[in-house]
Amino acid sequence: MAARLIGFFLFQAVSWAYGAQPCIPKSFGYSSVVCVCNASYCDSLDPVTLPALGTFSRYESTRRGRRMELSVGAIQANRTGTGLLLTLQPEKKFQKVKGFGGAMTDATALNILALSPPTQKLLLRSYFSTNGIEYNIIRVPMASCDFSIRVYTYADTPNDFQLSNFSLPEEDTKLKIPLIHQALKMSSRPISLFASPWTSPTWLKTNGRVNGKGSLKGQPGDIFHQTWANYFVKFLDAYAKYGLRFWAVTAENEPTAGLFTGYPFQCLGFTPEHQRDFISRDLGPALANSSHDVKLLMLDDQRLLLPRWAEVVLSDPEAAKYVHGIAVHWYMDFLAPAKATLGETHRLFPNTMLFASEACVGSKFWEQSVRLGSWDRGMQYSHSIITNLLYHVTGWTDWNLALNPEGGPNWVRNFVDSPIIVDIPKDAFYKQPMFYHLGHFSKFIPEGSQRVALVASESTDLETVALLRPDGSAVVVVLNRSSEDVPLTISDPDLGFLETVSPGYSIHTYLWRRQ
């Protein structure tokens, strides 16, 4: 109760303002609400404007239903609050941020395009415009994955080692590519694309199937590996003809998946030694000798595999010279402490970027695929993002941008959740708590922002991270996964004190000018 009273008095002097359009909430019986959007209405946010010097902006989302609501307060010359003090240390700098985003899978594209054009536009605007959460990363699967409705690659003609029959199907030309172009037009920020393959054509594989235990035939340096490396270049060539260029490719989506008998959907197995030699002899040279200025990210699998996978690949100078970064997935994070994996990998290879390339909830066998309005799932996202940022990761990529209420479509029924769920019969979509949790980072932390130290005066259950934006302003994100309200003060040594309170089950983003 005392904490609630403190929070009440702290914000008596704060003026409230709301985004351009408030949320229309709807409960589906879970812990919080979704925001309902249709052809005629969708909640939106104002473009980010820096508050006047000496004041701060606070964006708040709560389990009780606030969604990135803006308030403005004054930075005080003297501290008046008690309890937790978070001190910004801007001189202690860490990694620079690449960005935040999600994946344009076949399933995502099918769901978006099943909506009416006005509703499609509002969905894309929610993700990519200044009135939305301003994603700047899009992941693109190279050909089919489990979130497709059919199985295909770009070169299914057997023994076509010249890739003469390589071609993009309508999933790319009619679905994904047009939507990516729409996103690019809506965005005020440069959007970086990265691509990942799930499987090679079956005629290049030891098991002759898209799924199950199987890897490339032969040995690195041979015609099978060279053809597969050239397939990457063909993909980049094909997308370039549609005016799309890629920031990066990953060497393989979850390369360990293809090492398991009975793996249910598209995969291609690599050990770390196999990936090392494929990169050094085939993929690295193929990309370097192409016309594309594209980065190569290794691993693209669970961080549980670190640091060993990085040690195997990057200890070989011939492979290391082609590797820009290490991509990680989140699914086994509960078995892999960040310090022992991400932290140790950064210690060993401080000049190789770490990048979170896939995450979703609802994939584990004990989880319900979709839980409309789950606040806990939003907190799982923001907890992961903060943890990753604190351990040198430069960006965080969600999985499907939009799914249906079942969590698909997915050809092997591997249904999962998504920040946006599309209700096709109603020509509507639902923005979940996950969407807003992601927005607390993506909208306010543009590419080039740099993490700095933020030191707590005492042990706390709050999870926090601080960054300096390219414009010199400061951003602090505070996540409270507990039920208790927590009074706190943020100290900027050059300016003064931000007196505030973190309500139970909330996430806040603070933004202020430093000069």
UniProtKB/Swiss-Prot annotation:
Glycosylation sites: 38, 78, 165, 289, 480
Disruption phenotype: Homozygous knockout mice die within 24 hours of birth. They are under weight, respire abnormally and show rapidly progressing cyanosis. Feeding and movement are also decreased in these mice. Macrophages accumulating glucosylceramides in tubular lysosomal deposits are found in liver (in Kupffer cells), bone marrow, spleen and brain. Hematopoietic stem cells conditional knockout of GBA1, leads to widespread and organ-specific dysfunction of immune cells.
InterPro entries, per database record: GH30_C (IPR033452), Glyco_hydro_30 (IPR001139), Glyco_hydro_30_TIM-barrel (IPR033453), Glycoside_hydrolase_SF (IPR017853)
Regulation: Inhibited by conduritol B epoxide/CBE.
GO-annotated biological processes: antigen processing and presentation; autophagosome organization; autophagy; beta-glucoside catabolic process; brain morphogenesis; cell maturation; cellular response to starvation; cellular response to tumor necrosis factor
Known pathway: Steroid metabolism; cholesterol metabolism; Sphingolipid metabolism
Pfam family for this entry, one: Glyco_hydro_30C
UniProt keyword annotation of Oxidoreductase present: no
Principal subcellular localization: membrane
Active site positions: 254 (proton donor), 358 (nucleophile)
Membrane topology note: Peripheral membrane protein
Localization per record: Lysosome membrane
GO MF term set: beta-glucosidase activity; galactosylceramidase activity; glucosylceramidase activity; glucosyltransferase activity; hydrolase activity; scavenger receptor binding; signaling receptor binding; steryl-beta-glucosidase activity
EC numbers for this chain: 3.2.1.45, 2.4.1.-, 3.2.1.-, 3.2.1.46
Record-annotated disulphide pairs: 23-35, 37-42
Signal peptide: 1-19
UniProt keyword terms in alphabetical order: Cholesterol metabolism, Disulfide bond, Glycoprotein, Glycosidase, Glycosyltransferase, Hydrolase, Lipid metabolism, Lysosome, Membrane, Signal, Sphingolipid metabolism, Steroid metabolism, Sterol metabolism, Transferase
Reaction(s) catalysed (UniProt annotation): a beta-D-glucosyl-(1<->1')-N-acylsphing-4-enine + H2O = an N-acylsphing-4-enine + D-glucose; a beta-D-galactosyl-(1<->1')-N-acylsphing-4-enine + H2O = an N-acylsphing-4-enine + D-galactose; cholesteryl 3-beta-D-glucoside + H2O = cholesterol + D-glucose; a beta-D-glucosyl-(1<->1')-N-acylsphing-4-enine + cholesterol = cholesteryl 3-beta-D-glucoside + an N-acylsphing-4-enine
Subunit structure as annotated in this protein's UniProt entry: Interacts with saposin-C. Interacts with SCARB2. Interacts with TCP1. Interacts with GRN; this interaction prevents aggregation of GBA1-SCARB2 complex via interaction with HSPA1A upon stress.
Family the entry assigns: Belongs to the glycosyl hydrolase 30 family.
PANTHER family: GLUCOSYLCERAMIDASE (PTHR11069), LYSOSOMAL ACID GLUCOSYLCERAMIDASE (PTHR11069:SF23)
Protein name: Lysosomal acid glucosylceramidase
Species in which this protein is naturally found: Mus musculus (Mouse)
Lineage: Eukaryota, Metazoa, Chordata, Craniata, Vertebrata
Gene name per UniProt: Gba1
